[in-house]
Amino acid sequence: MEGAAWNTRAVRLTNDQCWGHLAAVDHGVLCTGGPRGAIDAVPVCFVVVGKVIASPIDTVKAKETTELGRLKNLEADATATLLCEQWVRFDWSRLWWVRAQLVRRSGHDLTVTLREECEDALRHKYFQYRGVEFADLLLFNVKSVTGWAESDDPDALRRAMSGEGAATRY
């Protein structure tokens, strides 16, 4: 495009920055492979415990059943992708995204301690889960993380993660 100025500040995030964003963000979109090759994407709550990502199947939010499509998909194919992002319409210097490639941990790969740590972390992060039992808990090993940010300015990244100066008009 004639006259277009390309942004030379945009950067690929380091592994540590990706993990920092994953730990701080409040939700993401979990993508699993559905029937006939379709991708099923669903917003999820999650926590990072060490290098494990945990997402609950709860009974807090209204749903017809706890036998969700993502569970069926993960039984057929244990791989998934978690996408987290921040979009600030009026301040593009704060745009970022992180993608984690995941593999579901199987039942024999779970320890009681890890499950309890993840449940405690979920209850600490999301007050709605305090005093509530989970129907199930999806635990994932992270194969890789990658991410992008509009700016490599550490202050812009800090502001983006803290929500500082967020636009309030729409």
Locate each region found by the language model.
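An N-terminal domain-cap segment
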Residues: 2-48
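Short glycine/serine/proline-enriched coil/turn segments at secondary-structure junctions
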Residues: 36-38, 63, 90-92
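Charged, gly/pro-rich active-site loop segments
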Residues: 1-13, 87-170
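Amphipathic alpha-helical interface surfaces
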Residues: 18, 66-70, 114-118
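A generic structural signal for short beta-strands and their flanking turns/coil linkers
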Residues: 26-28, 42, 49-53, 76-80, ...
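A short mixed-secondary-structure module that forms the rim of ligand-binding clefts
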Residues: 47-88
